[in-house]
Structure formats: structure tokens, C-alpha cells
UniProtKB/Swiss-Prot annotation:
This is Cytochrome c-554(547). It comes from Halothiobacillus neapolitanus. The keyword Electron transport applies. Gene3D superfamilies: Cytochrome c-like domain. It comes from the Bacteria. The keyword Metal-binding applies. Disulfide bonds: none annotated. PROSITE patterns: CYTC. Binds 1 heme c group covalently per subunit. Heme c binds at C15, C18, H19, M64. Keywords: Electron transport, Heme, Iron, Metal-binding, Transport. Monomer. One of its GO terms (molecular function) is metal ion binding.
Amino acid sequence: AGDAAAGKTLYDASCASCHGMQAQGQGMFPKLAGLTSERIKTTLVAFKSGDTATLKKEGLGGPMSAIMAPNAAGLSEQDMDNLSAYIATLK
């Protein structure tokens, strides 16, 4: 299971500039608040591995994938668990 406090630190440093401080989305960057931790983790894993089939199934994988993929590439399994735990607390 992920550590939401550690996830918040990582989110604030790496995700908030595009997705917003409360994950409400900004412009072309999607809202993450309200998603389950499972969906967030699945999506992060897909971005990291380049799994375009899963991204398309999730309604993702458009032009913004070029921005998201390198961000996900550096995440460890624990980072993804922590981010998923934190983002799932946001409504």
C-alpha cells in the first residue's frame, strides 16, 4: 500500500504544476481528483511502460502522453503506490 504523505510530497514537486494543487486539472491537463488509487496506478504503470492499449482504454494516450511519459519513467513502484494513495484522497 502507498504512503499518502510521501505521495503528497512527490505530487507537489512533480505533478501539481500541470494537474493543479488539488488535482482539479488545468486546461489540457486532466483532472485526477476523484479517481480511485487503482485507476491512478494502472495509468501511471501504462505511461511508464508505454502501454498505449491501456492508455486508450482509459481515454488517454493523446498528444499529452509525450509530456506525461517521461515524468512516469522515473517513478519507482513505491513512488507510484504513494502517488496513487495520495491522489485518491483528493475529491
